[in-house]
Amino acid sequence: MNTEYVYLGQNEYLGDALKSKYGKDCIPSSVILDKTLTGIGATFTEIHTKRNSIIIEPNVPVIVGKCQKESNCLGVYSETTVSEIKKYLNNDAIKYKKILTTPEGFKKIRKAAGNSYNQIQQTYFCLFDECEKLTQDCDYRAAITQPVYDFFEFKEKAFVSATPLNVSHPEFENQDFIRLKVEPLFDYRKNLHLIITNSYERTVREELERLKGSPCVCIFLNSITGINALVNSLNLKEESRIYCSEDGVKKLKECGFDNAVSSINYPLAKYNIFTSRFYSAVDIDLNVKPDILILTNLNQAHHTMVDPYTEAIQIQGRFRTKFEDGHTYNSLTHITNTQDLEVLSDEEVTQMIDEYTITYRELLQRYHSATDEARKKGLKQQLKRICEDYLLDERMNIDYFGIDNKYNEERVKRYYSSGESIRQAYEATEFFNVEYEERRQAVGEDDIFRIKYAPSEKVRIQRLAFALQQLDLQCSQNENINKSFFIDLLRNCYEYADLLIEMKEAVPIGFAHIASFGGASRKEIEKIVADSRNEKRRFSKEVIQDIYNVFQKHISQKIAKEECKEIVGEIYKKHNILHNQKDIKAKVSQQTIGEYFKVAPQNSEKPNKWRIEYLLPQFEELIKE
């Protein structure tokens, strides 16, 4: 897809830039309009352009907000009836019709238009706003792609966003779309404080303490469960309001929250918490300058991840009031933990998609060839299973936005594998000046959580071993760390933690392997520790003394090898040293005496004998009184 540029001056709006390039201040057709900046008036421009328009918005709140400001607009969503749309379309008093609809509401427009729908597609401009949401949301909101077929049938249409994603749908190429990129002629970068932590709740608490003097704190967290936990643990209920979907409002009311709403409600509270429904498109107009906190807690929900290239830019762009210093907010902070997530490379995603495509085409061919209704039904069910993976649309054609979603999902996951990866992503957007901070404890709350709630005991052991290894490393670099305190924290994570701690001291190489390359079962750890204890006892002062006392009289003399074996076995038994058992390393044989004394074989006579020469030097100190 070719790219053209339109240049935006300081204090200019999109309409000004378009007029400079095209001689008129309206959005051209067949473009993916990359605004670069939020709040430069793309929707405003379309609403005030002298033509009929259908503007598809991702969520209801933005539609409500725009319609409150523009009296001639019609909002179409769940509560809007077909008859209301018909009445609006037939209202001759409104010269230029401006319909703002959710993707799910679009079918009501089609139904209301009836036989006139083809005329609407020829005479109305169709604008798909915040177009990246098609890719980002189709995995859990399949209906968002419902208007796509209709969109491409409009004579004039455009995609628009400040943060559009790459698209693979072939119709963009077939219809000669171009990417129209807005290039600001001024420095527009925003300052962002990125905090990487392994103690999420503690860090959030610290930041809210820092912001206690702020007139308004706006928190963006895409998890109802996470919001519930945050408000309760930090006692924010009396000073907060939560903005989420209607379903989220119901869930929060069941948890005792009466301060949850589904649309912007002024005045805002001291603490305002928004789910992803409010990350884009919505205008938030304030008379006080807010502080913004973006929160990601991977231990709670992976969908709290925020894409630096899209969602982070959109979030800071919600605030439209410019204050005397030219800024719309005081501070922007993103707090996140990290995880070693399983991430597919683009090549692996391609291979997966290829296999889906092969299966899809084979099933589709068999479906069209089948003459038996039962076979057709079975094949259709199999096709629907692929559809459930959002790779087929409701017409059972390949869903290109679903495919784009797969790549996009893995791309964002890749950032959250380390703090440095997230930092690099933010810097690569060229939108943010990043102040990077790692706020970690030797053992953080998140480390404890991940150990306690590991999916299996083997993973729990691996995570605990890694935490112990990291604690050793940090203590070697900072002598002020209270190591025993953190050891006790880790002990409380796992009832067999002491076994692992013992292994770390006794078998450091084996322990390091478990920490770095994969866990072991508890039985394997018990065996390793038992062997270690055995080895320690075998060469303890008490055992050496007993062995020396028995064999002292045989020094410089011969003794049957089998007798040596029996004597050592009895001493091991006396000291509870496990030996000659399944899965136990310690074995007692005719050669074992050679681990304590210098011996010489005397095999010329039967039975075979040893000549005991002297106690090995390393044990001499142990037999001194």
Language-model features: where?
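Conserved Walker A/P-loop ATP-binding site and its immediately adjacent core
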Residues: 38, 42-80, 104, 166-168, ...
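The feature captures the C-terminal accessory region of ATP-dependent helicases
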Residues: 49, 353-625
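Inter-Walker segment of RecA-like/P-loop motor cores
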Residues: 71-114, 254-261
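Interdomain hinge/linker at the junction between the two RecA-like core domains of SF2 helicases
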Residues: 163-210
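A short beta-strand element within the Helicase C-terminal
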Residues: 283-297
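Conserved SF2 helicase motif VI
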Residues: 299-328
